[in-house]
Amino acid sequence: MSDARFADGLRYRIEIPSVEGPRVFEAVLDEAERRAVPVRRISQGSGVMMLTDGEISEMARLGADAGVEVSLFLGPRGAWDTGGQSLVTAAAGGVARGDAGIADSLAEVRRGVALGIRSFLVADLGVLKVLGDLRRAGELPSSLVLKTSVLLPCGNASTAVALEGLGATTINVATDLSPSELGELRAACSAPLDVYVEVPDDQGGFVRFYEVPEIVRLAAPVYVKLGLRNAPNIYPSGLHVEDLAVKLGRERVRRAELVLRLLAERTPELVEGRGEDHPADLGIPEP
């Protein structure tokens, strides 16, 4: 049993991933209000480079108004670059290639921060170290959330400690860890764990709704993430797939409602509300 909590005392928060732009974000917020789902973080996977300044600013405004963290992915990355290794193994898909890749990622962080974003998804160890060092040196906001990506999966306690030491504020775990293994990570580190309870097909495709109570008990504080299996990969997103991205975003919120209903039915003692409007550990935008 974990006694650790988020800054506002909660054991878990709801995260909706793959929110690819302001129109999708608006749809997620609308669906969350309609279904009474307390979404506290949205994350995006196409990357800062795939959003205009206006789109980033609008997402920052929406997040600030709703009290929702907005986490944008850093790139470019191996899977979209000229490297051939990512074509034969997904393990290289998130890496920043060469010093130029590190510099490009840093440029994306500085751009996002200037537009009000206070949370970024990091899929490369070198990028994480550089950003962690800059935050400690005061060259990036002290409130900046560095969220490791599922493309940089954490599968054991020692890795969790290493990631936290490099600067990770919140840690995406490997999608196939058991509740007891998640408990081992929790015993070793203080960073919240990001746990997919419905996993995209390209990350395993598991649906783990019935495990949520035990995950919360053993690994709190956790971000309960709702991916979608049996759904297309829409990265990099854009206007050509925006209607689909909106529908996928709404369905992720519906999936979250299903998880919360099950939690209330089976373990009502774990049911919690939305928490504080602006908890200190949430990367709410500052436009």
Predicted region positions:
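Hydrophobic, aromatic-enriched interface-forming segments
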Residues: 166-169, 176
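Conserved nucleotide-cofactor-binding alpha/beta core module
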Residues: 156-158
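Active-site pocket-lining/capping segments in soluble small-molecule metabolic enzymes
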Residues: 1-117, 122-154, 172, 179-287
